[in-house]
């Protein structure tokens, strides 16, 4: 019995000694912490990657076929295929140009702050293992590519039915490379308008493209419309309101990826962006319908989806 008691005392002393040594040297046992963090980061990267893959598909879905159907339903019947062709060709051309030069101009490591240079042209230095934050570089490239596709496609509504197909290709190419991509670099790519730029630590806050996408496309569309002048048949009603509604519905759903994906993470911020997007769209549609009811005596399908 005495021997057993002495063994228990020795074991207890060893445990206490081990605890004291652990407490004394825990600051030097840093190899334990990275192990835990690495597991958490791997899980987070997997969740973020899966969500942004879905968001990338949703944003592309906005152009093909969402925007095509929306604009196609608004024009005269004889120009529907022309609108489809414009949007489809823009998607193809912008994808190639973004791969070749656009991504590098927007997110390259340029030192001037005005453009990113050509260091990442043709995805130089980008492979399946390189990361951009918590995402694979190539996925971030693909997600931003869908933005570069839909932005010039938004301008189609300003010149549809009034310009040639070759002009669409030339204008969209030059506008994306010379206007859109540099502005992306200014705000999102660490350029002159980002944090630490000419505005100091404040920088320009553009969560999901209010400036980069919508304002740039809106100004370009306004300038083109002003140059072309009023339409001859501007009072002609849309030939297919059903197309307009289907296209607008696709845009509505696609915007969950557009806004929610701009969080670049699968977290509460993305969920909040999706919820706000949905409530805003619903409220805007009801508001527009109420305005049409007040002004014209009845609401219309095109007016409701336009809202």
Please name every model-derived segment.
Residues 8-12, 17-43:
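Short, Lys/Arg-enriched N-terminal segments with co-localized hydrophobic residues
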């Amino acid at each position: 019995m005495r021997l057993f008691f002495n063994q228990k005392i020795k074991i207890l002393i060893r445990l206490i000694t081990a605890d004291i040594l652990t407490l004394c040297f825990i600051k030097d046992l840093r190899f334990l912490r990275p192990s835990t963090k690495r597991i958490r980061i791997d899980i987070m990267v997997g969740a973020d990657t899966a969500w942004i893959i879905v968001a990338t598909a949703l944003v592309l879905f906005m152009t093909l076929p969402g925007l095509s159907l929306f604009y196609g339903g608004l024009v005269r019947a004889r120009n529907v295929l022309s609108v489809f062709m414009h949007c489809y060709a823009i998607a193809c051309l912008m994808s190639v140009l973004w791969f070749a030069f656009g991504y590098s101009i927007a997110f390259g490591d340029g030192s001037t702050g005005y453009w990113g240079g050509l260091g990442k042209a043709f995805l130089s230095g980008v492979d399946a293992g390189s990361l951009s934050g918590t995402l694979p570089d190539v996925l971030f490239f693909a997600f931003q590519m869908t933005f570069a596709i839909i932005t010039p496609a938004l301008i189609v509504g300003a010149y549809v039915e009034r310009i040639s197909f070759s002009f669409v290709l030339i204008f969209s190419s030059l506008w994306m490379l010379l206007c859109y991509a540099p502005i992306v670099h200014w705000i999102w790519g660490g350029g002159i308008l980002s944090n630490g730029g000419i505005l100091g630590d404040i920088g320009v806050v553009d969560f999901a493209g209010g400036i980069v996408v919508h304002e740039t496309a809106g100004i370009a569309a306004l300038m083109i419309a002003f140059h072309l002048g009023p339409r001859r048949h501007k009072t002609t009603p849309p030939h297919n309101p059903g197309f307009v509604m289907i296209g607008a519905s696709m845009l509505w759903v696609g915007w969950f990826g557009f806004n929610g994906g701009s969080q670049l993470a699968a977290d509460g911020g993305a969920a909040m962006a999706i919820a706000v997007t949905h409530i805003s769209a619903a409220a805007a549609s009801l508001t527009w319908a109420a305005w049409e009811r007040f002004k014209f005596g009845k609401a219309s399908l095109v007016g409701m989806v336009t809202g």
